[in-house]
Design a protein with these regions (language model features):
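Sec-dependent signal peptide recognition
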Residues: 19-25
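M14 metallocarboxypeptidase catalytic domain recognition
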Residues: 2-5, 13, 21, 34-598
């Protein structure tokens, strides 16, 4: 059955004045179930001006594959009480724009008169209760899996929900149903996502969302950073930002999530976070951030084009409609720098270090949903949780509706990516594209909508800063074990050289290169910038006990991001590789004798 996409694409949304126009391709995009059918080319188009009265696109009409309630559901016997809220950081008129929802969500951390959110012990008990409830019923199976420990020894756990024969990863894979991975609170001061996932865990296990499990499997990690959550602080115990550690995998928390992804192979990954109200907006633009949610799917170089189309038409558009139906507002993920002279507002960038982009490079539909609330304490907490529950319920419903297509999509993408080895070009460094945008804020005094025109760095059509011929694979020195271990955590196939060999390859040499404007943003995000390099064609000596990483595998694009030295956040830039002599590009299929690492 071919996959049908509408002619309009997401880049026609919400922009005020286009800077560049690119040609559109055919109005229909077809992908046959047979993987021999080539994916049609797709050239993104920078947005055209649109009327401000039609901010949200109409969702693509889809015949539901299963009839379930996918709007937020009220928990049993809710108690209509007002939670303890923090002092207002803005005027009462602005606060009035964020009324509590009609539904009252009930988790341990959302009870009346609480000053803290769900504790680690309460979270464990809540998840355990969902497993216990399902043990008394037939059909749905549940398990609470230990997936690791935080830097301070707190348990990291995942709740698995399925109608398969078991809850281990092999059983989920044999169901033929797509698996959705939901995780939250990788920054400890972003609690709404965690509380929302507890609500969804109960509704999937015992409530009105349980019928979705006829079509999908769900894995939930409600809290990835329990150490930060215990302090109400963003960073992990060692001071790392877990949100920027999904390529390097330096923290045990990010490693635990990577192992879970490697084993359960989710087709859809959702990161539920919160965005922080920034003082830069009132100072530079005279307005307060207004949106209940910011959302962005993977926007990084070398993504399969079909993932971008699926993220837009199968997920983002229905999600917009769901939030709008609940009276909630949403915008692309964006931020402004604290530099008073810099009036640019930027979408999240193409760097592969966050989960949104890293999981996209693993051929999953990867989405980041951030509610309005980091740093707000308990202020508007019911609305923030309502935003998360509404948005993620839409993602679950979209996955159930597209379950058959998504199950066909994974083998197609894996074959396509693996088949690109030794062919064409690969983008090493990309940047957002400058544009103009009408951004809505709130008047800080009256709370009324306020629209301003801003310089806008768009991630919807990336600029290629540097690219080179795609190699057949990469050679790594025998001293590159730390990098090899991280690649294998991701699920990358790595071969060990058994007999000394000579390989035709490109060697890296340091070479000056003009600085790019994005380097300042990389520094603000804590992303290591790679060195400036030039390529020298030559012979690579591959001794025994060195390594070969072929690109003829499904995770080839993740390998490129990790091993091209000048890619942002690369393993050389982040010092998992010691120097340029530890890595080389192999430019012809090697005949070297190797064995796959166990």
């Amino acid at each position: 059955m071919p996959y049908l996409f509408s002619k309009s694409v997401h880049h026609a949304l919400l922009f005020r004045r286009p800077v560049v126009r690119l040609a559109m391709t055919a109005p229909l995009f077809l992908l046959a179930a047979c993987t021999s059918v080539p994916l049609p080319p797709w050239v993104p188009e920078l947005p055209r001006p649109v009327s401000r009265t039609n901010t949200f696109p109409t969702p693509v009409p889809v015949e539901p594959a299963v009839v379930v309630q996918t709007m937020p559901v009220a928990p049993p016997a809710p108690v209509a009480v007002s939670p303890v809220e923090d002092p207002l950081p803005y005027s009462p008129a602005v606060a009035a724009r964020f009324p509590a929802p009609t539904v009252v969500y009930s988790t341990p951390g959302l009870q009346a008169n609480r000053t803290n959110f769900t504790t680690q012990d309460e979270l464990h008990a809540w998840l355990r209760d969902q497993v216990a409830a399902l043990s008394r019923s037939a059909g749905v199976k549940a398990a609470l899996l230990p997936i690791g420990a935080s830097q301070q020894g707190r348990a990291l756990e995942a709740l698995v929900l399925t109608r398969g024969s078991g809850t281990d990863h092999a059983s989920l894979l044999t169901t033929g149903r797509p698996t959705v991975l939901l995780f939250a609170q990788q920054r400890g001061d972003e609690p709404a996502g965690s509380e929302g996932l507890l609500v969804l865990a109960r509704e999937l296990a015992q409530g009105l969302l349980q019928p979705l499990l006829e079509r999908i499997n769900v894995v939930i990690v409600p809290r990835l950073n329990p150490d930060g959550a215990s302090r109400g602080e963003a960073l992990a115990a060692g001071g790392q930002d877990i949100a920027q550690d999904h390529l390097r995998l330096d923290t045990p928390e990010a490693q635990a999530l990577a192992r879970l992804v490697r084993d359960y192979q989710p087709m859809v990954v959702v990161s539920a976070g919160e965005y922080r109200l920034s003082g830069a907006y009132p100072q530079k633009f005279g307005g307060v951030q207004k949106f209940d949610a910011l959302m962005q799917y993977a926007t990084t170089p070398n993504l399969p084009e079909f993932l971008t189309r699926a993220g837009e038409e199968w997920y983002r558009r229905p999600l917009l409609a769901s939030l709008k139906g609940q009276g909630l507002s949403i915008e692309w993920s964006h931020s402004a720098s604290s530099d008073a002279s810099d009036r640019t507002v930027s979408m999240e960038g193409p760097e592969p270090v966050n989960s949104r982009n890293a999981e996209g490079l693993k051929n999953a539909v990867s989405v980041a949903i951030d509610s309005r609330g980091a740093g707000l304490g308990r202020l508007h907490i019911q609305r923030r949780v309502h935003t998360q529950v509404t948005a993620i319920t839409s993602v679950l419903g979209s996955t159930a509706q597209r379950a058959r297509e998504l199950s066909q999509l994974r083998p197609y993408l894996e074959k396509e990516v693996a088949g690109l080895a030794c062919k064409g070009q690969v983008v090493v460094l990309a940047a957002n594209t400058p544009a103009q945008y009408d951004l809505q804020l709130l008047d800080p005094t009256t709370g009324a909508d306020k629209t301003i025109a801003v310089d806008w760095d768009s991630a919807l059509a990336l600029r290629t800063v540097s690219s080179r011929i795609r190699p057949c694979g990469y050679w790594l020195s025998g001293s590159s074990t730390p990098a090899v271990e991280r690649l294998r955590l991701h699920g990358v196939k790595v071969l060990e050289v058994i007999e000394p060999s000579a390989l035709l390859g490109d060697l890296y040499r340091e070479a000056p290169r003009p600085a790019i404007a994005q380097s300042g943003r990389l520094a603000r995000q804590g992303v290591a910038a790679g060195p400036d390099v030039a390529l020298v064609r030559g012979v690579v000596d591959a001794p025994a006990k060195s390594f070969y990483v072929p690109l003829s595998q499904p995770l080839a694009n993740l390998v490129v991001a990790a091993l091209e030295p000048d890619a942002p956040g690369s393993y050389l830039a982040s010092r998992l590789l010691k120097g340029l002599g530890d890595v080389a590009r192999v430019m012809a299929e090697p005949t070297v004798k190797t064995q796959e690492l166990p």
